[in-house]
């Protein structure tokens, strides 16, 4: 089928897409390849239109093309580099389609009309001493029938719990990664690009089929916690009840803000994430969704860049060890602006967790060190005190088990902390004894108190 599309060079300064009234601008980085380009997929019939990139579209390693004559909502796209295709790392939305009997991920064009974006700014931030945080997995938080939510496991479901969180005294939620993950493998393109011979195609097909025939199929494990290489700009579609995850995510943030609850995101970067990508991701969520802060995890090579970025100086930043001296150095090129502040930074470490657990279960020679840490207030920056985290025992586990029992998750006991400083109150695991249950409840209240 022929489509009335026209392609012309465009000039942009960053990767990604910009949606126009009658088309879009596509930009992507390609290094050292024999051929590259854009593949457009017409969503109603999944017919493809391939746009090869020539030097006319290139500015350095950034290739940009302006496509006119398309309706953004009707098209998906992928890029190709030599023999492979891949989704756009800067896509705002991903969708799954089936083509030729195979599942394929397409990047979507999302118009982001002005009325779908929040006004720039965010709610008034609290002092660190006033913040009470709750770490949340969006899907798991309302997945149970006991959540009484009509939108279980979604952004809307979490928004429905805003009043519940407020009544608990929670005034900040830290969300585990909420963006799409990159597909684990690159897909073979349909119809090879010019320059690939028929014999090369046949050899590739033969080798691929031989490997598949001799490799036993392993059941795929769900990446439940959503840590991995991300499409950082695309809120996760499976966390949305609607077909517009961006709008649902934005409305969730607005609802939490209206209830006085700040929203912090965990950003997990792999080694493939550049400093530029990490900085742009943080700026994107602040300007587009009014996010109040970030907990950087994984490869935080952009830590110093993000922490000292003037645009993010009012945005909370959690990490395990900040280079405070380097961050507070005077700007030699512009000394009149003064030294940068670090009051938006907050230290995340397990020292308090370990001491609190040992103190509550009455370990010897821990009282003095616990009291010292309990009353110490960091100068100029924040510090999070917590007794449980998703990387180890839950609060109920902490008073029910002396040893971890991760037997059913396929990891053979390799995951989780080896030493949880826990105490089972006399019985390993669940117990029906009233005195054991009462002791465990008392211990949990003690933990909540400290």
Each PLM stretch: what is its role?
Residues 147-154, 185-258, 269-288, 405-429:
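Aromatic- and acidic-residue-enriched carbohydrate-binding clefts of CAZyme catalytic domains
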Residues 30-36:
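Short proline/glycine-enriched turn/loop motifs at strand-loop junctions of beta-rich domains
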Residues 1-22, 50, 57-135, 142-150:
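The feature marks proteins involved in alpha-glucan
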Residues 24-27:
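Structural beta-strand segments of beta-rich domains
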Residues 160-178, 288:
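Catalytic domains of carbohydrate-active enzymes, especially glycoside hydrolases
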Residues 247-330:
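Active-site neighborhood of glycoside hydrolase catalytic domains
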Residues 132-134, 173-175, 263-265, 294, ...:
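Hydrophobic faces of well-ordered beta-strands that scaffold small-molecule active sites
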Residues 290, 303-450:
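Conserved alpha/beta catalytic core and glycan-binding cleft of carbohydrate-active enzymes
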């Amino acid at each position: 089928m022929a489509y009335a599309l026209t392609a012309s060079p465009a000039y942009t300064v960053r990767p990604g897409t910009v949606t126009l009234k009658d088309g879009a601008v596509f930009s992507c980085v390609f290094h050292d390849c024999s051929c590259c380009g854009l593949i457009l997929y017409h969503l109603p019939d999944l017919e493809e239109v391939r746009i090869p990139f020539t030097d006319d579209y290139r500015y350095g390693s950034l290739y940009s093309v302006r496509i006119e004559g398309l309706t953004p909502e009707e098209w998906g796209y992928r890029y190709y580099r030599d023999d492979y295709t891949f989704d756009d790392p800067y896509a705002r939305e991903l969708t799954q389609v089936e083509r030729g009997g195979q599942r394929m991920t397409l990047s979507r064009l999302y118009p982001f009309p002005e009325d779908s974006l929040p006004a720039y700014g965010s709610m008034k931030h609290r002092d660190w001493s006033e913040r009470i945080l709750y770490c949340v997995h969006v899907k798991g938080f309302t997945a149970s029938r006991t959540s009484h939510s009509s939108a279980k496991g979604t952004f809307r479901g979490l928004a429905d719990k805003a009043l519940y969180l407020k009544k608990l005294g929670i005034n900040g939620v830290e969300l585990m990664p909420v963006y799409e993950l990159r597909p684990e493998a690159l897909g073979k393109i349909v119809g090879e690009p010019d320059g690939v011979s028929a014999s090369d195609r046949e050899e590739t097909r033969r080798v691929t089929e031989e490997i598949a025939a001799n490799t036993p199929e392993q059941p795929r494990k769900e990446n439940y916690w959503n840590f991995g290489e991300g499409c950082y700009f695309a809120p996760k579609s499976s966390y949305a009840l609607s077909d517009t995850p961006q709008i649902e995510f934005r409305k969730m943030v607005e609802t939490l803000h209206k209830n006085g609850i700040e929203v912090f995101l965990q950003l997990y970067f792999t080694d493939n994430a550049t400093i530029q990508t990490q900085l742009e991701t943080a700026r994107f969520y602040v300007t587009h969704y009014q996010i109040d802060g970030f907990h950087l995890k994984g490869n935080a090579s952009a830590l110093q860049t993000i922490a000292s970025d003037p645009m993010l100086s009012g945005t909370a930043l959690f990490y395990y060890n900040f280079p405070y001296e380097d961050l507070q150095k005077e700007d030699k090129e512009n000394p009149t602006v003064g030294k940068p502040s670090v009051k938006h930074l907050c230290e995340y470490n397990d020292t308090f967790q370990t001491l609190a657990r040992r103190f509550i279960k009455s370990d010897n020679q821990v009282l003095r060190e616990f009291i010292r840490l309990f009353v110490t207030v960091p100068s100029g920056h924040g510090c999070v005190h917590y007794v449980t985290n998703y990387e180890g025992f839950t609060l109920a586990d902490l008073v029910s088990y002396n040893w971890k029992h991760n037997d059913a998750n396929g990891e053979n006991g390799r995951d989780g902390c080896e030493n949880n400083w826990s105490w089972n109150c006399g019985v390993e695991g669940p117990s029906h004894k009233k005195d054991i249950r009462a002791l465990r409840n008392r211990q949990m209240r003690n933990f909540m108190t400290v």
